[in-house]
C-alpha cells in the first residue's frame, strides 16, 4: 500500500470502513462549530488582523497566532469542515434513503449515482481490438475539454469487451469517478458517456465535495491548480497549528486546576492528540520497514489503532507528572526522520534520487516535533541555582 493511499484511508475512515467515515465526518461538523465559536469569542479581534506579540512570552504569542490563523484562514477552515462533514454524512444519507427512493430495489440508487456496469461478456473471443493510443487521441478530439486520467478494460478478451476512459472536464468540479467515456473495445464505438454535468444541482454539489476537500483543482487548469493546491496546503498546515495552539492554551489554562476530572481530561487530551501524531508517524515508519507481502494486508490499520489506543491507555496508567505529550511528540519526530531515512537509503545505494517532496516534508515535520519536545523539556526543567560568590553574612 503506497504511503499516500495509507494516509488517504486514515483521513477518510480511520481504517474502520464506513463507520469510520461517518465518525470522521462528525469531526467536520465539530470543526464548523469550533469556527463559529471562535468567531464569536474573538469578534473583537477583527481590528487586530496583524497583531502578533512574539516578545511577551510563549502563551501570549500562541494566543495571537491562534487568532491570526483563525481569522485569515476562516474561509478555508469552513471549506474543510463543510466538505468533510458532507462527504461521509452525505453517503450515510444516501444509504438510509435508498430504500425510501427505491423500495423494491435499493441498490438502484448507486447505479443512478455511479452509472451502470459495463456490458456483460458474450462468451465469444475477441478477434482484434482498436489501438488504445488511437482511441485516446480520438477521445481528445471528440471531447476537447476532457483530460483523461485513468483507463480500464472490461472483459478484454471477449467480443463484448469495452474500455472506459475516466478523467476530468475543464471548468467542472468533479472527479474521474463521475466523468467517464465508455467505448467498444473491438471497433472504438462510443457506448456511453457519464458526466456530473448531466445531474441535478444537489447531486452536482455533492460530487464537487471531493475535489474541493482534497485539493483536486486540475479542472481549473495547470496555473490555477498549482496556486490553489499550494494555498490549500498552507491552510491545512495552518489548521494543524490552530489545533495545536488551541490545545496548548486550553491545557495551560487548566494545568493547575484541582478538580480530578479536569486533570483526567487534560491527560486524555495529551494521550489521544499527541498519540494520534505518534501513531501516524510510526505507521509511516512501519510501512518502510515491513516486508512487501504485508503491505496489502489489514495490518496497517490494525497497527495504527493499536498504537493510538496504547497512547490513550498510557494517559490513564502513567503517573500524572510523567511528560506524556513531550514523550509522544519526541517519538513522532524520531519516527518521521527514520521513515525518511528508510525511504531514501535504498535509492541512494543505487545512486539515484526519488521525488524529494515527501521525504523533505517528513524531515521538516520530524525536526519541528523534536524541537517542540525539546523546548517543552527545557521549559519544564527547574532553574539552575546561581553560583554563590562572596560572603552573604558579611
UniProtKB/Swiss-Prot annotation:
Q: How does it sit in the membrane?
A: Multi-pass membrane protein
For this UniProt record, the keywords arranged alphabetically read as follows: Cell membrane, Membrane, Transmembrane, Transmembrane helix
| InterPro entries tied to this protein | PepSY-ass_TM (IPR005625)
Record's superkingdom? Bacteria
| A single cellular component GO annotation | plasma membrane
Q: What is its main location?
A: membrane
Q: Name one Pfam family in it.
A: PepSY_TM
Subcellular location(s) of the protein: Cell membrane
Where is the chain membrane-spanning? Answer: 22-42, 60-80, 81-101, 231-251, 271-291, 303-323, 328-348, 355-375
Protein name per its UniProtKB record: Uncharacterized protein PA4219
